[in-house]
């Protein structure tokens, strides 16, 4: 697979390469071929974690591998998908077009509004589509290919939501910048939160959600389980409000 990606990235324009990656993922996903790959266990679990009327926010929607699955499920709900990179945003707009209950936002979320530098890493001749990330201005001076992206204030956006059931966040090390500003809104809205956490922030996040009455959970051998700090399987973290725990466990593990 790696050699194929390297060849495609070498011979195709970036937009075509991204289209191939996107279409290839959903073909393999829908055929069930990715079920045995632990990297995609939350993708297959999404339909069991959501209901048709849920309001979902996808922070760092990327190529839409989660966004499209969310949109398929929440037919009577609402999806807000945030993606600041122009090439990725274009691909997202195509695959989410059939879903009128989605709102695609061409921006990142951050602690404050503004413009920040972002990079898309190319490693060993392959564009790492899952690793674009915001960098500092000092780091930007040492990168040849930097994109300036729009950032909206996360707290301001969340404060406008009357209802929120689920948040997915994958923003490659920038997650604490966002969530450290959201305690008041998370307390008000009480969504389930699925988040990829950089190792250096695990302790802060666990304490943060514990303080708000959330329970740390994860997926282990196909089941939803309670976790404590480092997880049994490397994957996203799932934080569930204590008052929703019994219902989610009963629904997921039946």
Task: Name each region found by the language model.
Residues 1-254:
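Phosphate/nucleotide-binding beta-alpha loop and adjacent structural elements of enzyme active sites
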């Amino acid at each position: 697979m790696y050699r194929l990606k390297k060849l495609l990235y070498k011979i195709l324009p970036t937009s075509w390469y991204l289209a191939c990656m996107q279409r290839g993922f959903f073909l393999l996903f829908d055929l069930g071929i990715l079920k045995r790959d632990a990297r995609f266990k939350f993708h297959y679990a999404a339909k069991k974690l959501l209901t048709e009327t849920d309001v979902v926010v996808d922070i760092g929607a990327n190529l839409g591998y989660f966004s499209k699955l969310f949109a398929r499920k929440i037919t009577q709900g609402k999806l807000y998908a945030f993606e600041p990179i122009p090439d990725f945003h274009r691909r997202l707009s195509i695959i989410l077009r059939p879903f009128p209950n989605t709102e695609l936002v061409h921006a990142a979320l951050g602690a404050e509004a503004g413009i920040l530098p972002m990079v898309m890493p190319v490693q060993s001749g392959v564009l790492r589509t899952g690793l674009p990330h915001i960098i500092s201005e000092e780091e930007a001076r040492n990168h040849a290919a930097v994109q300036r992206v729009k950032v909206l204030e996360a707290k301001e956006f969340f404060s406008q939501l009357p209802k929120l059931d689920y948040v997915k966040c994958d923003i490659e090390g920038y997650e604490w910048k966002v969530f450290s500003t959201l305690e008041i809104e998370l307390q008000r809205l009480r969504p389930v939160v699925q988040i990829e956490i950089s190792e250096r922030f695990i302790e802060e996040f666990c304490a943060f959600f514990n303080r708000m009455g959330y329970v740390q959970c994860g997926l282990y051998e196909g089941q939803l389980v309670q976790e404590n700090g480092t997880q049994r399987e490397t994957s996203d973290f799932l934080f569930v409000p204590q008052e929703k725990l019994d219902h989610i466990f009963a629904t997921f593990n039946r």
